[in-house]
């Protein structure tokens, strides 16, 4: 199949590395994939090797505007009919965001037709899905989308998009429940297909005197870093040796740095900044990390953790994890596969981390169980096969509909 993948920024930026294994696996399975980022520019942090598979144009480049004008001239009535549902956008800000991607959506319809795409798939149910939806309507090529978390909460015409799509994919049961709560109907072909990750055939066992605890997460409020830092102070007061590494960038770094200094932790807490995905996996493969921690919190209004790919990757490398019972994390970290603690509770976090650091046998047992959990639910080969089957089924249904017409 020839599949177009619409992303927010990938191959650019630092936030969509979790999509890369899925794309690679589809390519290795014999499918052609063309990546179309909604927005372009910025650093090639994770996706440098994907640029050659991408069609890159800014939202309103000369080529995009020229092609969009041509599509409007050739199929004005169909284009206006495709655009009409955008009137139902539930707020002015969402409507303006949808309007902003119209030229690129029209351009995408032309690109998909010229490339002879069999299917259009997009990640995120926001404006990337608006692009894919409009392009599908104009080109007649079936489409689908993957919804994550914030994009479900935003509810940018989610139910309307899902009715048009051949598959509304959710990465967690929690996400599907959230979508049902904002109007996703029973007539929609919706399914939970979890994110797939690359998992190594072998895992490394750390051989060090000082422990390394890693938190691979953006420095944002929902990730709960302040509770982890407070937990680290508790561990230091208990005499626990080792370092805490924070991998990720974000607006909270100055505030967290001040907290670290005020708690006298500057000698044992390190900011790694944004770590390229391949380098992060190399740390895991080399046995450089003893425990991975996510201290995520629920901020209300659906603003909580999905199923964190960062945890899946660590578990897949046999690294034991400590996480908070927030959002979709509870679907991933089951009893014996990791340590799950109350959110926003530094003492509970400290206790969970100390349990693992103080007991090598427990670390090995939890790490092995976590790895098996990741293999069973998130191996990218299985996930990509499931997606490819869904895309192929959509193509068959589309062909049958065309034959009947």
Descriptions of predicted regions:
Residues 17, 210-234, 239-240, 251-258, ...:
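A conserved mid-protein helix/loop that constitutes part of the nucleotide-sugar donor-binding site
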Residues 37, 152, 158-202:
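Donor nucleotide-sugar binding/catalytic pocket of nucleotide-sugar-dependent glycosyltransferases
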Residues 255-281, 286, 290:
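Nucleotide-activated donor-binding/catalytic signature segment of Leloir-type glycosyltransferases, i.e.
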Residues 293, 311, 316, 320-323:
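Short hydrophobic beta-strand element within catalytic cores of glycosyltransferases
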Residues 332-346, 355-361, 376:
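Conserved acidic donor-binding segment of nucleotide-sugar-dependent glycosyltransferases
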């Amino acid at each position: 199949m020839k599949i177009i993948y619409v992303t927010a920024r990938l191959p650019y930026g630092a936030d969509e590395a979790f999509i890369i294994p899925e794309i690679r696996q589809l390519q290795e399975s014999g499918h052609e994939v063309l990546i179309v980022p909604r927005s372009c520019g910025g650093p090639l942090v994770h996706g440098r090797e994907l640029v050659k598979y991408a069609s890159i144009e800014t939202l309103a480049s000369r080529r995009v505007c020229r092609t969009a004008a041509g599509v409007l001239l050739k199929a004005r009535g169909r284009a206006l009919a495709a655009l009409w549902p955008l009137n139902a956008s539930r707020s002015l800000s969402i409507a303006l965001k949808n309007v902003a991607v119209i030229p690129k959506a029209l351009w995408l319809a032309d690109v998909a037709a010229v490339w002879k795409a069999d299917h259009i798939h997009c990640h995120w149910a926001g404006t990337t899905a608006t692009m894919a939806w409009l392009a599908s309507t104009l080109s007649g090529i079936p489409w689908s989308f993957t919804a994550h978390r914030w994009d479900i909460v935003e509810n940018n015409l989610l139910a309307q998009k899902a009715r048009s799509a051949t598959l509304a994919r959710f990465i967690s049961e929690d996400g599907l429940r959230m979508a049902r709560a904002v109007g996703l109907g029973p007539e929609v072909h919706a399914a939970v297909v979890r994110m797939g990750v690359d998992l190594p055939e072998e895992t490394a066992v750390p051989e060090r005197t000082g422990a390394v605890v890693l938190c691979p997460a953006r420095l944002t409020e929902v990730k709960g870093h302040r509770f982890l830092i407070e937990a680290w102070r508790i561990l230091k007061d208990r005499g626990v040796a080792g370092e805490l590494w924070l991998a990720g960038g974000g607006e909270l770094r100055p505030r967290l740095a001040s907290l670290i200094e005020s708690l006298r932790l500057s000698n044992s807490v390190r900011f790694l900044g944004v770590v390229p995905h391949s380098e992060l996996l190399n740390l895991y493969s080399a046995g450089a990390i003893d425990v991975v921690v996510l201290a995520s919190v629920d901020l209300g209004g659906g603003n909580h953790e999905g199923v964190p790919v960062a945890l899946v990757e660590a578990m897949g490398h046999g690294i034991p994890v400590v996480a908070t019972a927030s959002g979709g994390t509870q679907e991933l970290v089951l009893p014996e596969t990791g340590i799950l603690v109350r959110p926003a509770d530094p003492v509970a976090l400290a206790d969970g981390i100390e349990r693992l650091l103080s007991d090598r046998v427990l670390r090995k047992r939890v790490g092995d169980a976590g790895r098996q959990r990741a293999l069973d639910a998130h191996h990218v080969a299985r996930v990509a096969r499931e997606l490819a089957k869904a895309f192929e089924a959509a193509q068959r249904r589309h062909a049958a509909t065309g034959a009947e017409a």
